[in-house]
Amino acid sequence: AAGGKKKQKKEKKQKQRGGALGTPMVIGLSHKTATVEVREKLSIQEANWNAASAKLVEYPSLQEAAVLSTCNRFEVYVVAEDHYAAARDVFDFLKQHSGLSDAELRPNLFLLHDDDAVWHLLRVSAGLDSLVIGEGQILSQVKACYSHAIANESEDEPAGSAGKVLGRMLNSVVMAGKYVRSETEIAKGAVSISSAAVELAV
């Protein structure tokens, strides 16, 4: 029943916007763009990812949404027709959530859309965008993002806010990440930042 309500809500939202599906966009920050202090202010516990994405899709420009929050990155994946309006709305959400000002937040963010957004997430899931290249945790974290994003409502969390576009995109990058790890040697060496630190200390 919960899954049916979720589907009806999404269909109603798309109907109100002319029934057209938007295209993907990612807004976020990482160890490459932001300090630990800024990343910590944006961090969201995994148990609250769906609550955050539910708030995001309340914005009129956003059709679908998913959140990925780790120690080294915070990324919001959305689907929208008007990427300018979507960027404005996601930025508003990030300001409210973090309590950071425009000047504190804006310089740390990156924005990618359409094919660039997909390629970015492929690099993330494969471990190519990690602090330690090929580290093993990130694929599990992207898988968790996908699982939450497509989940039905439960006693523990709201339903995910991914629809056709984000659902397919997240599933595809998880499959690609698995393929990269099984068919290449990228996973050799340190599997995480902590293990890399241990190796350097020995």
Describe each region flagged by the PLM.
Residues 1-18:
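N-terminal mitochondrial targeting presequence
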Residues 15-130:
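A glycine-rich (often HGG/GG-containing) alpha/beta subdomain
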Residues 104-202:
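Glycine/serine-rich phosphate-binding loop and adjoining beta1-alpha1 elements at the start
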